[in-house]
Amino acid sequence: MENPTVFGKIIRRELPADIVYEDEEFIAFKDIRPRSRVHILVCPKEYIPTLADYPDTPEGALKLGKLMLTATRIAKQMGLEGYFIRIHVGEKGGQEVFHVHVHLRSDA
């Protein structure tokens, strides 16, 4: 299924974004409405709507682990001394874009 979200459009370069990191599996870009001094969105290029849609399998765990490690790698590359990582799950959990993503934020 083609990713219909704004993140899919960024991945396909149909919309501009301030990209801070990209590899074969992930892309990270600055949030257009930052809530911290540093506010980066890290998402897999594979379209997965929510965290709850990851399979409860070793492969799903590996994909989630890579997502978290990618966010950590970006924080290190940016020289962040302190940060937090947040994932909203579902509409009731505050998720606005239905393509799983990590908020990497810091005011440090």
Residue positions per predicted region:
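HIT superfamily nucleotide-processing domains
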Residues: 1-108
